[in-house]
Amino acid sequence: MGFVKGACKKDDLKKGLFDDGEGNMVAIPDTGTCALLQPYHVSRGKLFIHERFDNFSFVDSELVSSCIERTRFPVSGWKEYEDTKGLPGLARVADLIGQLGDSEYLHKISALFYKFEELGINEGINCKSPGELRRGYAHFFWGVVHKYVENGVNLLQVTQEGKEWISRLHSHVFECEHFILDSETQTNLWFWIRKVFDLSSIIGDSWSLPIKNLILLILLDAI
């Protein structure tokens, strides 16, 4: 909810002023998307819960708020944020795997890149294209995310749906680890692939498919 303009009571859509969840108001231009609320979305989400549910006894708004807080990223250095087994820690697992294990995640890399561009993040991480962002996926997972989701992954093994999420997550990691080619290699590979398909049109379709497959396997093995 922290990304939604108008979610917090003090948000003023007409003036383009939005509560940052910490008692301050931030201005977002008409041309700015909800992505500009990224730095504040966790605090805004907590504020939303307190504003809407503090008066309802059946909702433990403090617990919900602590779960939202644990999804803050980068992760705070405070010791309590190291816990990965409690409910807030598992909420972080759900948040991370829900994003990185999304079946369409790798197709959304371009949108994520332009979100980062709007926020000025790309310059800070020296990322110049969606391809470079995709290239860093596996490193980001193993170097940053894995230690926070390991316990949650074990729990997901209990159900079939959970196993499917794990499978998609590992599939994304594997794809980014093993199918990354530099631009020169990509150019050379596609040059020879075009040659293979041009050759098949000359040879004929009756026996060209096995030949194409064999040549493509040789090309990929040579990379």
Language-model regions, residue ranges each:
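A generic short-segment signal for beta-strand/edge and adjacent turn/coil regions
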Residues: A35-L36, V59-E62
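An active-site-proximal "capping" alpha-helix that borders the catalytic cofactor pocket
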Residues: L37-N55
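Alpha-helical context
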Residues: G21-P29, R44, F73, P88
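Divalent metal-dependent phosphate-bond-processing catalytic cores, especially two-metal-ion Mg2+/Mn2+ enzymes
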Residues: F3-K14, E51-F58, E69-I223
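A cyclin-like helical interaction fold
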Residues: G45, S61-I68
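Post-HEXXH active-site segment of zinc metalloproteases
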Residues: A7-G32
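Contiguous, well-ordered alpha-helical segments that form the cores/surfaces of helical PPI scaffolds
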Residues: M1-F3, L47, S66
